[in-house]
Amino acid sequence: MRIDALALRNFRNYDALNVTFAPDCNVIVGENAQGKTNLLEAIVYLSSARSPRARAEKELISFGRSECSIKANAFARNRDFLLEIALAAGRRRKILINKVPVKKGSDLSDVLGAVYFCPEDLLLIRDGAAARRKFMDDALCQLRARYAQALSDYHRAYEHKTRILRDSEEYPSLLDTLPEFDLRMAQSGAVIIYYRARFCERLKEYAGIAHRECSGGREELGVEYQTVSTISDPLAPIETIYDQLCAHQASHAAAERASRMCLSGPHKDDIAVTIGGVNARQFSSQGQTRTAALAFKLAEREIYREITSRTPLLLLDDVLSELDPRRQEYVLNRILGGQVFITCCEEDRLGTLLSGKVFHIADGKVV
């Protein structure tokens, strides 16, 4: 898969941009705050209708403007696609694939897949559990439409239940509606756990391989999925996981009402990471945790390849400058194959790249 051409209008700091890309490597050079990351964000958004940075879609619209658009000519599954997204303040976004309106971001993921790697991802191992849940969610929402729907359903039910518990002291009758939201959370939560567990099994294998190669085989990377305590086997069928989630809800019902907090469900999931058998988050060095984070992102790309038999777009947002020369060389050797986008401040850092195009960005323009 690849993006051949991209057009932006009123997107972030781009008033208007029209650019054509190479099918292999695209190096985007520029000083900080010129629009390099914004360009990669637009590509990621085209692959999933999810921004890796913005909390709200209105943040994507240029300051002082009321609407923006992203368009791309793409090639995937042996055919051409025209992808279009239009955002307007106060209105629902519009997504079109070959001029046909679609409602879900997962429809875009059926065309394009993207693995986005930014400097913040190097903290993936040391950050809190929310960062590792986001890592799983970002990967799985592109791979499994059912997962994306379950995650959306779960978040809605979780928010409703949280409000009910919070307001129940003042309005006790609200508690009568809790069983409905418990049911919804158990149904969607079982799907989430089912797919996360399988993702982590593949992550263990592929990240382990990448970590051994990058570390010279000196250390072993351990990966273990952690979820609700009553789930005896996260790899069990969804029906079994659902029953065990219901049991966990029942055993925590009184505590939830007393604390007015939602205590049961996969919203507290985590990935336990060890390096050489030692808790990586607590005891590993910065270099060790960066190597592990690098292995996670490279593994994400391999998992996508395995499941879809296609190579996703790879976007490296100023990551190489954060790595030592040995890790830089390892990454550059591993990204061969498929379309790649790399941002950097200095072009000479990428002298080992043999083919592709170089773009110089300044103030939201290609110069």
Question: Predicted regions: what is each one?
Answer:
Residues M1-E31, P172-L313, E322-R326, Y330-N333, ...:
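Conserved NTPase motor "head" modules and their coupling/switch loops across ABC/AAA+ ATPases, GTPases
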Residues K36:
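Conserved lysine of the Walker
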Residues Y45-E57, A299-I307:
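Post-Walker A helix-loop "phosphate-sensing" segment adjacent to the P-loop in P-loop NTPases
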Residues S48-I125, A129-A131, D137-Y147, K204-I209, ...:
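Nucleotide-state sensing region of NTPase/ATPase domains
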Residues D317-V319:
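Walker B catalytic acidic pair
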